[in-house]
From Swiss-Prot:
Function description: Component of the cytochrome c oxidase, the last enzyme in the mitochondrial electron transport chain which drives oxidative phosphorylation. The respiratory chain contains 3 multisubunit complexes succinate dehydrogenase (complex II, CII), ubiquinol-cytochrome c oxidoreductase (cytochrome b-c1 complex, complex III, CIII) and cytochrome c oxidase (complex IV, CIV), that cooperate to transfer electrons derived from NADH and succinate to molecular oxygen, creating an electrochemical gradient over the inner membrane that drives transmembrane transport and the ATP synthase.
InterPro entries, alphabetized: Cyt_c_oxidase_su8, Cyt_c_oxidase_su8_sf
Pathway linked to the protein: Energy metabolism; oxidative phosphorylation
The keyword Transmembrane helix is assigned to this record: yes
UniProt gene name: Cox8c
Family: Belongs to the cytochrome c oxidase VIII family.
Residues that span the membrane, as ranges: 41-64
The organism of origin for this protein: Mus musculus (Mouse)
SUPFAM superfamilies: Mitochondrial cytochrome c oxidase subunit VIIIb (aka IX)
Name of the protein described by the UniProt record: Cytochrome c oxidase subunit 8C, mitochondrial
Disulfide bonds: none
Amino acid sequence: MSRLLLLCSSLLRHRAVLFSKPGHPGRLSHSESPQKKILSPTESAVGIVVFFTTFYIPAAYVLSSLKYFKGE
């Protein structure tokens, strides 16, 4: 078979994900065109804030409590 149907959650949304070539599992082609949704500036700002706080708040906590993690 030159194209194998990849069973995943996209089938529930009536999309089929197909391998483009045998032996190239990283390259997939979708059966529908890509969506053209443009993010608003507010959505972009919220996404950036969430992204950076997800990584910087735990790092700041660890760095501020470093003497306790070392074992004094």
